[in-house]
Amino acid sequence: MTHPTVAVLGVGAMGEALVAGLLRASWQPSELSLGVRRTERGEELHDRYGCSWSLDPVEVVNGRDVVVVAVKPQSVPHLLEQLTGAMQQNQTVLSLAAGVVTRLYEDALGDIPVVRAMPNTPALVDEGITGIAPGRFAAEQAMEQADVILQAVGGVIHLAEHHLDAVTAVSGTGPAYAFLLAEALIEAAIREGLSRGVAERLVNQTIKGSGALLVETGKGPFELRAQVTSPGGTTAAAMHILEGRGFRALVEDAVAAAARRSRELGEAARRVEE
């Protein structure tokens, strides 16, 4: 499909990752407009990407096919107050705000197509994964627009909206789990006598390569782990410690806490709107 023109409201880490990804994917700067809160930030982004910007969200969204909301969840109600009456039914809202349900946008803006999305930070290097779900008025065209935009920074999975809090907890938060594991492995390597530089190179490539095995071989994690776990070997000794000390339960508890917090953020945004 033809590139939809895009307004990005909120150009923090994720918003900027999307802008950069779209430009790499052959969008032109003239096809993007950016909404910022500070003049200095707008000028910085214009110098870097050549896109127009404004402090006024109404000006930013005017005439754009898709409006990406990439502000913090608690900022959504105020943004919707500013946009009330400013959007047309042929525009699509693509919300990246964690926990904020499509109904909140629909109640504020009317019968406008809303697609809720949860990306993750590997989008910075075009290796992201995003779960998306349609609101009540988001038909095929709106979902196609969301697809083509988000595919510029990685993969896209279509889901029902009630699954997106789980997506937030698994893939949205997931990079932090991987980074924490990397931190722990690096520190453990240093305690075993390796230099930090060597430890970082070993750990970073090991995590990258393990992810590639999962993606490219089609084998599941259990099978891949079994392949490197010989009875009585070094990997078996390590797995015994991790399993015995509740590694799985810790991960499950962490995911549950993140999903719960996603729901809480959505509830808080609804209370502010009311």
PLM feature segments, named:
Residues 2, 204, 208-274:
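NAD(P)-dependent Rossmann-like dehydrogenase/reductase catalytic/cofactor-binding core
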Residues 39, 48-49, 53, 57-132:
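Rossmann-like NAD(P)(H) cofactor-binding subdomain of soluble oxidoreductases
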Residues 104-113, 129-167, 179-216:
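Internal alpha-helical scaffold of NAD(P)-dependent oxidoreductase catalytic cores
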Residues 167-176, 225:
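A short glycine-threonine-serine/GTX helix/turn-capping micro-motif
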